[in-house]
Amino acid sequence: MSEPTSRRPAYARLLDRAVRILAVRDHSEQELRRKLSAPVMGKNGPEEIDATADDYERVIAWFHEHHYLDDERFVMRFIASRSRKGYGPARIRQELNQKGISRESTEKAMRECEIDWSEMAREQAVRKYGEPLPSNFSEKVKVQRFLLYRGYLMDDIQQIWRNFAD
């Protein structure tokens, strides 16, 4: 018979919890640390794992060693995922920063991803406002505001009207 979770060592419970977390999607190291240290809902309400800092470090090291936790892979997949959803480089950088990814790692991955951000900005504008894109000033401002919110840079937005003039 399996022993109750309260009697299992904290390290084993942390390892199980980390496996469940990483089975859903890739996470950054900082995200995994945050989720592991947060209380988990049990049958009788929130339960905390009484683990030591060493237990957390051992779990993180185990996942790095077995290549289940890799910030570089996470960043590349995150950029691909968010860009497919129509978000621009500024927003993606901000989200990666919130997930604890260093600026250097983010910039390296952004250079390697080879995404044409001005073309993506145009696709988003056409999807939202239709073809041809508006040419009067007030409508252009609406398009710019929408694309800035989505995380595109002003240079990429201005390229839409320079490169793709109707």
Swiss-Prot record:
Matches recorded under Pfam families: RecX_HTH1, RecX_HTH2, RecX_HTH3
Compartments, as annotated in UniProt: Cytoplasm
UniProt record, GO biological process: regulation of DNA repair
Main location: cytoplasm
Record-linked InterPro entries: RecX_HTH_1st, RecX_HTH_2nd, RecX_HTH_3rd, Regulatory_RecX, WH-like_DNA-bd_sf
GO CC terms, sorted: cytoplasm
Family: Belongs to the RecX family.
Protein role: Modulates RecA activity.
Record NCBIfam families: PRK00117.1-1
Protein name, per record: Regulatory protein RecX
Organism: Salmonella paratyphi A (strain AKU_12601)
Gene, per the UniProt record: recX
